[in-house]
């Protein structure tokens, strides 16, 4: 089952004519659709005035009264993040793999936010040292200056969280040059590879990120949660694993970080 979910998360569906790809939580499926549209995941109705951005391309637009939106002809040579934001809804992002993907109408389902949701960051973040190969995953789309090799955020979790199952959700991540990412063809580096990005909660390591993609979840052990107190998430980018006289950090970009309780 884990392998099936993993494959669904990474799959990209190419369609022709009026056939559209529906995106929901990083999973794609095919349906008939004439234009790009953002809809409510429960009602199926179009969501008005949702903001659509492709940060690396400095593109922004908004949906109309029916949730429809247009995308111009944008040159995309490597996977690039598209983000959807609307007040009262969970932030959503997906990875566009090529310019051809934008030629196919897409339907994006977004879910209303819950009271227990915690939005950590909806901006695109560049981790690393700004030193990367042109063959690195998504190197051509890196536009932001690095904030350093790690990202940390403090936030409060209530005692109710300890009675739920909690996850750190990473909307999208690009740029990982791990051994697994290389094996999957996500970069073109001939020999070198990096260690995976590491996730820490209150100073304890809770997971790793090995591949680029959307809607990746890391479970937060309830035993580590400090109820009604400050908690901290830290994401550390990996390092080049080839011998070197200095530390070479993997440059990655992440977007839409949140804590969800179920």
Predicted regions and their residues:
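Beta-strand-rich domain onsets/edges
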Residues: 18-33
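Sec-dependent signal peptide recognition
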Residues: 2-7
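Short, ordered, surface-exposed loop/turn motifs in non-cytosolic proteins
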Residues: 32-34, 41-56
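Hydrophobic h-region of N-terminal signal peptides that target proteins for export
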Residues: 11-18
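Surface-exposed loops/turns
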Residues: 65, 76, 227-228
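Beta-strand-rich recognition domains
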Residues: 28-31, 42, 95-262
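Short, acidic Ser/Thr/Gly-rich low-complexity loop/linker segments typical of extracellular
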Residues: 57-70
